[in-house]
Each structure stands twice: as C-alpha cells, then as structure tokens.
Amino acid sequence: MESAGIYQTLSKELGSEVYYQRPGGLILIETEEQLAVMEEVVANQKKCGMEVEIISGDDARKMEPYLSKNIAAAAYSALDGHADPIATTLAFAKKAKELGAEFWTHTQVTGITVKNGAVRGVQTSRGEIETECAVVAAGAWSPFIGEMVGLDVPIRPRRGQTMVTEPLPPIFHKELLCARYIAIKHHPELAKGSDDPGLKLGVGLSIEQTEHGNLLIGNNREFAGYDVSTSFEVLREVCNYVTRFVPFLKDVNIIRTFSGLRPFCEDGSPIIGATKALPGLIFATGHEGDGIALAPITGELVSDLIKEGKTKHDISSFSYDRFIK
C-alpha cells in the first residue's frame, strides 16, 4: 500500500513520466474451491488495511461485459494500478544521474572484497569499487552474487510468458487476474501432480490494456532455468485458458511474444535488508512478480538502511538471516 502511495506522486518527484494508472482490478474466480482460497486472501488483506472485497460474477460482468459466464465470483480492489516498468526504470536512472549517481552498464560483477569480516569493495570487469556497502539487487541472478561470499541465496528464476495483441479500441476497464494464477504464485507445488497440461505449466490469466490499445495477455509461472525464450506449448495453453474467461479473444491477432524471469524465493517472501552473515551486505531481491509494484518502497527502505542504519518499518521478517541455520 505504501509503495502504491509513492507511485501516485512519483512522476512529479522524478521529473519524468512513469505512466502510473489506477483503474482497479479483478481476480476472477471459477470454482467454490478457488472462492474459499480467495475469501481467506481477502480477509488477510483487509486486516492489513486494503480496500478489497468479494463480488458476484454478475457484478464482475457489469464492470467488464466481455467476461464469460464461467466466472462465479471475483475479488475486487478499486486501488489496483500499474506503471510502465521501462519508463519507471529510466525515470529512476535519470533522476539518480542528476543527483550524482554513476552507472556502469555492460559491466560484470566478478567478486566482493571482504576484509576483517566486512564488505570493503566490489570487483568488476572494469575494476574495483571501494565501498563499505554492497546491495544485492540482481533479481534472479542474486544467487551468483551470494556465492561470491559463500552465501546460499535461495532464489530460482521463474519464467513468465506474455503475448501482445494488435491495438484494439478501449475494451477492458480493470486489470484482470485469476484465482488460479494467484494460487500458483504462492504454491508452485500445485502444478506438479496435475493432469491438466495448463496447470502443469503454471498457466493462469492476466490481461492489461495499454494506453496504445494493445492487450498484454498471459501469463504463466514455470521453472525453466535461465531460458528466456517463449514456447508454443505454453502460449497455446495460455490462449486456451484465457478464452474460457474472455471468448472473443480467440479472434484477436497476436503481434509478438516475450518472456521474463522472476526471482522466486523459496518461502515466497522477498529478501530485504542487512545480514549478520556479512556486515556491509544488503539484500533487495526475491520479489518474484511483485518487483515493479514494490520497487519504490524497497528502494526507500534500503536507502534509509544505508544512510541511517535503520528503517521506519520493521523488516526483520524479510532478512536473509531467516535462512541461516
């Protein structure tokens, strides 16, 4: 919630547009089993102060008339929003440069210098940077940084594949997800023993319409190593599943596909903060598919930790130290 609050004024603060919008969102529910899961999720979200509720399938169709009769109910939040991830990244980088930051692109980190049991530098393909603080923010590649100092970072790359349609007139007013997609996110074991080919591949539904009219249609969650290709097998299952919810999409043209790797942490929570294992090392990784959503608050927490040695929120439950036995 705090990250969403930051996004509302982020374009003004950074001096560059991040294209943040807040249209609200629906998580579509097909079965009684899914409904029971989402009722528990919504109850927990309400305890955290989130404005979210379970609505009927008919009410969901009033919001999005193209939805099929397969939808029994939905979880609805008027506060769901999104930003352009590329524009947001570039806006942060531009502002950082204005404030004196230096970026070394196409530069490989080759090691961490440790002296007297603490971080004293970062070794790169362009030379060494002397520093008493190093932030591990390498996403799915964070385990390779951990190995440099003997730490086992329990993160695996989790691929997601997305399709982009031809531009269409404004069709969808809300962001759309499905309950199965949420369940697979937190319980990847659900996909293992299933006879459903789509479920085996971690296929769910996510639909978002861009300001240019293109639909971003996905998605799936699969452990495929560091392979960033797309596959016909997965995209076919995504199409089969998505058209159960929005039948007219079977007649829409796909113009391109892409994939990305999410940093999946073994216990489902990100790793944020310092560690007793190595003073000077700070983690900001393992956000899985929530990286862009949680980027502003994560950056603020890490910045406070570096400057003040503490954060305004208790982040101890996100510490790497929870994995030290």
Named regions from a protein language model:
Residues 75-133:
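Helical element adjacent to the flavin cofactor pocket in flavoenzyme catalytic cores
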Residues 1-63:
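Dinucleotide-binding Rossmann-like beta1-alpha1 core, especially the glycine-rich loop
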Residues 54, 59, 101, 271, ...:
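C-terminal lid/capping helical subdomain adjacent to the catalytic/cofactor pocket in oxidative enzymes
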